[in-house]
């Protein structure tokens, strides 16, 4: 599914938070040993994004809320639902992974509730080893990348589908 990048300038907002325009080349500025489950979001990039988000960054919060209201809600009609106030931010640098284990979000340790859906929004092109890999049916193990271009999003069941990342080459 696509979204209007002019109405919902999520990439531009991420660039603002990180202080970088060329998201595809962040690996030229930041290098880390391969992440573990304990440190996969302990980077300067995550700190910049979440610090800005927690500061009351109205440009992002307003855009994100509008995206949910105008793009996501129509998919579900009038059905009531709640959504994550602070979205999860993933950085998938070359030579690393975003999350270093395959998992289902509802499994112990991840603790996401039953019935939760995932909406992944691409602010860069996602393909091959820089994409999230997921099985198509719970337990099937037929992993394939969820490929998207910047300006696209996908809705999927990360609570039931085993998914993760490859080392981004």
Regions found by a protein language model. Give the residues of each.
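N-terminal auxiliary "cap/dimerization" subdomain that precedes the catalytic jelly-roll/cupin core
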Residues: 1-75
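Glycine-rich, often proline-containing surface loops adjacent to acidic residues and nearby aromatics
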Residues: 42-55, 83-84, 116, 130-132, ...
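Conserved aromatic-histidine-acidic binding/catalytic patches
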Residues: 52-60, 107, 111, 146
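Conserved double-stranded beta-helix
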Residues: 69-127
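Short helix/strand-bridging catalytic loops that position acidic/His residues to coordinate divalent metals
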Residues: 104-108, 134-144
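Conserved active-site beta-strand-loop modules that form the wall/rim of enzyme catalytic pockets
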Residues: 115-121, 125-133, 144-146, 152-153
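Catalytic core of Fe(II)/2-oxoglutarate
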Residues: 138-169
